[in-house]
Amino acid sequence: MTEATLSVYAAIRSRRDVRAEFDGTVVDDDTLRRILGAAHQAPSVGNTQPWDFVVVRKPDTLSAFAAHVADCRQDFADKLDPERRQTFDPIRIEGIETSGTGVVVTYDPNRGGLHVLGRDTVDDTGLFSAVLAIENLWLAAIAENVGVGWVSFYDEAYLTELLDIPAPVRPIAWLCVGPVESFQEVPDLERFGWRTGRPLDDALHFEQYRRS
């Protein structure tokens, strides 16, 4: 393997969903642009590039979204049984304000017109394309020693209104992006006992899906 190949694998292994590790500084514009450039180079069905990136840095917007996320997190917590709630409570949904930068990735289902090459029978390939851009962004951020935290505790209609996103464009991810003090060795959900990762062999099938 070349050094570059090893670096790719190292980035994948060290990728973490960052919450409490942001150092309070803001990622500089040049670095952010390199990271977004990597995201924009992701593969996409029919070369439609159905994503857009909304960079959010205004403190009032960050604060408003953080408050909304806290409410959504509480709603989820209230649905848990006592034992599961005890495991969940230490898991914080932080980083919206301390990262100083939110990158909202959107998906435009109309990008590319009515007939998109490769999307005719599997419509979700458009959405999958936008998610590939997120993965590119995340790995590029790791290479820059920049953390990313994917926030999914939000109401889509609220975020659409907050950022004045036109229909039918959808916000599919709010990513907290910023320099970090360090990356955790063990993913948070494993550290706090919420869920452990599956071994590759459990996910690997040959020729047909193996029923357990």
Predicted regions and their residues:
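Short alpha-helical scaffolding segments that buttress acidic/His motifs in well-ordered protein cores
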Residues: 12, 35-39, 175
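Glycine/small-residue-rich phosphate/adenosyl-binding loop
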Residues: 49-130
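Glycine-rich phosphate/pyrophosphate-binding beta-alpha loops
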Residues: 43-46
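Small-aliphatic-rich amphipathic alpha-helix that forms the alpha element of a beta-alpha
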Residues: 35, 39, 103, 112-162
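Short acidic N-proximal helix/loop "leader" segments that mark the beginning
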Residues: 1-34
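C-terminal helix-cap and adjacent tail motif
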Residues: 2-4, 11, 18, 90, ...
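Short secondary-structure boundary segments
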Residues: 107, 153, 179
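A glycine-rich helix N-cap at a beta->alpha junction
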Residues: 73-81, 93, 164-188
